[in-house]
A protein has these predicted regions:
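N-terminal, polar/charged subdomain of small-to-medium soluble alpha/beta proteins
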Residues: 1-117
Length: 117
């Protein structure tokens, strides 16, 4: 069996969510950008969808988690990180970044939080 380190990347997944420390942020909502990088040990001689992580499952999971109420992007990123890890036993590295766009602070375009293993 030929096992190779591979990386599946979900880039720039945009989601509107109602997170934030301030009540008006949770009322109005805002745009979030999600990046997920999943390191996998795959058998490259017989690649099938069942052998890897289906990125549609990752997108669906991300949308579901971002519907929850969080006051901090650290909370949403941590929840997403732990839930993605449950998708496959072949995940050996994971990096999740949640970026909050259009922050209600003058001259600040975005802020992000990243967790990686």
């Amino acid at each position: 069996m030929n096992s190779t380190q591979t990386v599946l990347k979900i880039n720039n997944l945009e989601i509107w969510a109602y997170h934030g420390w301030y009540p008006e942020e949770r009322l109005i909502g805002g745009l979030y950008n999600i990046d997920i990088s999943i390191g996998l040990d795959l058998n490259t001689t017989t690649l099938q969808l069942a052998d890897t992580v289906d990125y549609q499952d990752v997108v669906d999971l991300t949308k579901s988690i971002m519907k929850r109420e969080f006051k901090l992007i650290e909370e949403s990123c941590t929840a997403l990180y732990h839930e993605v890890l449950t998708l496959s036993t072949q995940i050996n590295q994971l990096e999740v970044t949640v970026t909050k766009l259009n922050i209600p602070i003058n001259n600040l375009q975005s802020t992000s939080f990243t967790i990686r293993s």
